[in-house]
């Protein structure tokens, strides 16, 4: 009887081991490489879902809400933005390092024409999980770049320095000059 129980115990252990070995052969999760019915390993899921810069399609009107007279092609742009999960509900995924990237976008003004122009967008370079309440405290000491047209500015959260989303070359392409105080493209002074 002991032999029979021992044999059943070892047989079940072997079956469990073989079953686990079969399912743990799943390849690491890579975009497009995932096969149906494969089990993705915990560490692969964890690494891909944790707070990090990830390519995100951002609607241009979300970044430039006042430019309603144009139709943009493409209407959204791929930007690296912070996304993902933090291990605690009291934390959120926030950018700790940002920079501007300039892209060529077709700007169409209905019944007037179109041109390819440069537009500047904010990209996230590094992200961290930080306490939600600390983020509000961290942003407040800087104060706003401008009371009006805040969307025209980007602010470095560490130095509080404000810079323009518009670029000088973008303004010059429209025969205008960049006004660094207002971050708008103005007519040249004579």
From Swiss-Prot:
Keywords: Angiogenesis, Developmental protein, Differentiation, Disulfide bond, Glycoprotein, Growth factor, Heparin-binding, Mitogen, Secreted, Signal
Binding partners and assembly: Homodimer; disulfide-linked. Also found as heterodimer with PGF. Interacts with NRP1. Interacts with BSG. Interacts with CD82; this interaction inhibits VEGFA-mediated signaling pathway.
Gene Ontology process terms (BP): angiogenesis; cell migration involved in sprouting angiogenesis; cellular response to hypoxia; endothelial cell chemotaxis; induction of positive chemotaxis; macrophage differentiation; monocyte differentiation; motor neuron migration
Listed name of the protein: Vascular endothelial growth factor A
Gene: VEGFA
InterPro entries (UniProt xref): Cystine-knot_cytokine, PD_growth_factor_CS, PDGF/VEGF_dom, PDGF/VEGF_growth_factor, VEGF_C, VEGF_C_sf
Function: Growth factor active in angiogenesis, vasculogenesis and endothelial cell growth. Induces endothelial cell proliferation, promotes cell migration, inhibits apoptosis and induces permeabilization of blood vessels. Binds to the FLT1/VEGFR1 and KDR/VEGFR2 receptors, heparan sulfate and heparin. Binding to NRP1 receptor initiates a signaling pathway needed for motor neuron axon guidance and cell body migration, including for the caudal migration of facial motor neurons from rhombomere 4 to rhombomere 6 during embryonic development. Also binds the DEAR/FBXW7-AS1 receptor.
Keyword Disulfide bond: yes
GO terms, molecular function: chemoattractant activity; cytokine activity; fibronectin binding; growth factor activity; heparin binding; platelet-derived growth factor receptor binding; receptor ligand activity; vascular endothelial growth factor receptor 1 binding
Domain of life: Eukaryota
Cellular component annotations (GO), alphabetically ordered: cell surface; cytoplasm; extracellular space; membrane; secretory granule
Glycosylation sites: 100
Organism annotation: Sus scrofa
Localization (cell): Secreted
Signal peptide (from-to): 1-26
Cysteines joined through disulfide linkages: 51-93, 82-127, 86-129
């Amino acid at each position: 009887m002991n032999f029979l129980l021992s044999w059943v115990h070892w047989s079940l252990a072997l079956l469990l081991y073989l079953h686990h070995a079969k399912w743990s052969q799943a390849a690491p999760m890579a975009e497009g490489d995932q096969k149906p019915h494969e089990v993705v390993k915990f560490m692969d899921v964890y690494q891909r879902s944790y707070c990090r810069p990830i390519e995100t399609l951002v609607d241009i009107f979300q970044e430039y809400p006042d430019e309603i007279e144009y139709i943009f092609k493409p209407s959204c742009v791929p930007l690296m933005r912070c996304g993902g999960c933090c291990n605690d509900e009291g934390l959120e995924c926030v950018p700790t390092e940002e920079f501007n990237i300039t892209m060529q976008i077709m700007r169409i003004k209905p019944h007037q024409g179109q041109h390819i122009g440069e537009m500047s967008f904010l990209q996230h370079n590094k992200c961290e999980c930080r306490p939600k309440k600390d983020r509000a405290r961290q942003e407040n000491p800087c104060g706003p770049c401008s009371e009006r047209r805040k969307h025209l500015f980007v602010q470095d959260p560490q130095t509080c320095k404000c810079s323009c989303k518009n670029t000088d070359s973008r303004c010059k392409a429209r025969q205008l000059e960049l006004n660094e105080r207002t971050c708008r493209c103005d007519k040249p002074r004579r």
